[in-house]
């Protein structure tokens, strides 16, 4: 078993792109922990629309007001990344009941792989509960206005890349 720090949380995701819902979750988690590491996953199987480094940059820009938040890209197994940063908490967002089954399965697998790490679920603020990266991408791809769902830099990146 690795030494973990329960004051360090990892919030993993593809963040393709980072949305106002993600930002809200990090903003509410930041005061609860000494450090929040936003782990931006390479996730080649998901076929991200934005390259990893651009997703990391956009997340850093969106979260720069939080001194205890760092954004790191990774291309390893999540369990290895969590151990690498020494985190004792894995943060996940639950928007709706539809998220629960998948998140419960992932939490169970992570408990098997990294039993020393606890998974903590946070629900979004109501105004962000319907936002997902895939919906934001689809709306942007079809020429819709996503400025209410993501930071301006993300909106510009989507216009350029989709």
Swiss-Prot record:
Catalytic activity from the UniProt record: (R)-4'-phosphopantetheine + ATP + H(+) = 3'-dephospho-CoA + diphosphate
Pfam families linked to this entry: CTP_transf_like (PF01467)
MF terms (GO), sorted A to Z: ATP binding; pantetheine-phosphate adenylyltransferase activity
Gene: coaD
Residue(s) at site: Transition state stabilizer: 22
Annotated substrate binding sites: 14, 46, 78, 92
Sequence positions that bind ATP: 14-15, 22, 93-95, 103, 128-134
PANTHER family attached to this UniProt entry: PHOSPHOPANTETHEINE ADENYLYLTRANSFERASE
Enzyme type, top EC level: transferase
Subcellular location: Cytoplasm
GO terms for cellular component: cytoplasm
Keyword tRNA processing in record: no
Predominant subcellular localization, coarse grouping: cytoplasm
Protein name according to UniProt: Phosphopantetheine adenylyltransferase
Gene Ontology BP term (one): coenzyme A biosynthetic process
Enzyme Commission number(s) from the entry: 2.7.7.3
HAMAP family named among the record's database cross-references: PPAT_bact (MF_00151)
Pathway(s) the chain acts in: Cofactor biosynthesis; coenzyme A biosynthesis; CoA from (R)-pantothenate: step 4/5
């Amino acid at each position: 078993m690795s030494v973990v720090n329960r004051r360090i949380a990892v919030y993993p995701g593809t963040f393709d792109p980072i949305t106002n819902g993600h930002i809200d979750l990090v903003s509410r988690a930041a005061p609860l922990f000494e450090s929040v590491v936003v782990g931006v996953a390479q996730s080649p199987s998901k076929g991200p629309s934005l390259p990893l480094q651009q997703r990391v940059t956009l997340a850093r820009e969106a979260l720069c007001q939080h001194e205890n938040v760092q954004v790191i890209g990774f291309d390893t197994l999540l369990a290895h990344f969590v151990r690498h940063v020494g985190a004792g908490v894995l943060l996940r967002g639950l928007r709706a009941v539809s998220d629960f089954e998948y998140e419960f399965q992932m939490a169970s697998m992570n408990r098997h792989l990294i039993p020393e790490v606890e998974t903590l679920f946070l629900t979004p603020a109501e105004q962000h509960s319907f936002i997902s990266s895939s919906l934001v991408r689809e709306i942007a791809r079809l020429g819709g206005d996503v400025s209410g769902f993501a930071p301006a830099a993300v909106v510009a990146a989507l216009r350029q890349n989709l």
